[in-house]
Amino acid sequence: MNGTEGPYFYVPMVNTSGIVRSPYEYPQYYLVNPAAYAALGAYMFLLILVGFPINFLTLYVTIEHKKLRTPLNYILLNLAVADLFMVFGGFTTTMYTSMHGYFVLGRLGCNIEGFFATLGGEIALWSLVVLAIERWVVVCKPISNFRFGENHAIMGLAFTWLMALACAAPPLVGWSRYIPEGMQCSCGIDYYTRAEGFNNESFVIYMFICHFSIPLLVVFFCYGRLLCAVKEAAAAQQESETTQRAEREVTRMVIMMVIAFLVCWLPYASVAWWIFTHQGSDFGPVFMTIPAFFAKSSSIYNPMIYICLNKQFRHCMITTLCCGKNPFEEEEGASTASKTEASSVSSSSVSPA
């Protein structure tokens, strides 16, 4: 094995020289230069600095403006809540441990950080599944006269949390475990060892099939059908131009969220799967650290997508920030009006975020 396994940790360095120490008790500066830990701490501080205000603003603006409280937005707000969980439960912990060069908060801190990081990522993924199904049902109309309403949105919220907890909670109760990974200052699922009594192999296979592959297959199926339906509707001119435009804007926004999720999480998932299927192979601490910390940036991309692609949300946000006045009122007004009109013409979910 090209690493050192100990109680609740795996350090990617063979302990031939005797310098490997527990990441819960000693700085891990023998793995990489101390400056790298300072850089990770600064990166986490940046994510907190951006992630908290932008997600809090998303929640506040939606609560403040009644016209944004649509069933579809319940799912989008769910993402903001999950991102805030990641910021407070995960990012603050990782920033603190990076500044010390090891997981100074011990096993409890590792469980907290690993749990919130996994929970946030899974809520994001299953929220995208619910959004994809909603888009498919609204645009493709496999169920005639179906209208996505408040009850459906609440059921969707409950579903995302149930599925996310089904992935994040088992390592807390003995099915697999959370251990420090990479440079040993952030925690994740144990892909690295076959530790006796934890059944890591069965959990990792379960997680990759039920909580990664199947959700992505559902998303790809829904959007494959959706793109075909949009082209057919445009060719047949079955709906008004205003409704079609609103449908396209919502669909484009959600597709961008799916792409952003894949960009953030696919490298981490790929590296984790490689480590799991090549246990004992030689790899450095940075090999897992870079994709793991890159995945954490997912907490800021969803609200940025709302702001960039959703004119109605952007209009409400500017109004809130400018104390009830929008200096770009004339420019934004027409777009907002068209969105409101589209919302009344089509399904209640047509008006995005």
Swiss-Prot record:
This is Rhodopsin. InterPro entries: GPCR_opsins, GPCR_Rhodpsn, GPCR_Rhodpsn_7TM, Opsin, Retinal_BS, Rhodopsin, Rhodopsin_N. Glycans are attached at residues 2, 15, 200. Disulfide bonds join 110-187. It comes from the Eukaryota. Belongs to the G-protein coupled receptor 1 family. Opsin subfamily. GO terms for cellular component: membrane; photoreceptor disc membrane; plasma membrane. GO terms for biological process: absorption of visible light; G protein-coupled opsin signaling pathway; visual perception. A motif ('Ionic lock' involved in activated form stabilization) lies at residues 134-136. Residues 331-353 are annotated as: Disordered. The chain crosses the membrane at residues 37-61, 74-96, 111-133, 153-173, 203-224, 253-274, 287-308. Phosphorylated on some or all of the serine and threonine residues present in the C-terminal region. Contains one covalently linked retinal chromophore. It is found in: Membrane; Cell projection, Cilium, Photoreceptor outer segment. The record marks 113 as: Plays an important role in the conformation switch to the active conformation. The lineage of its organism: Eukaryota, Metazoa, Chordata, Craniata, Vertebrata. Pfam families: 7tm_1, Rhodopsin_N. The keyword Cell cycle does not apply. It is a multi-pass membrane protein. Residues 334-353 have a biased composition (Low complexity). Keywords: Cell projection, Chromophore, Disulfide bond, G-protein coupled receptor, Glycoprotein, Lipoprotein, Membrane, Palmitate, Phosphoprotein, Photoreceptor protein, Receptor, Retinal protein, Sensory transduction, Transducer, Transmembrane, Transmembrane helix, Vision. The modification N6-(retinylidene)lysine is found at residue 296.
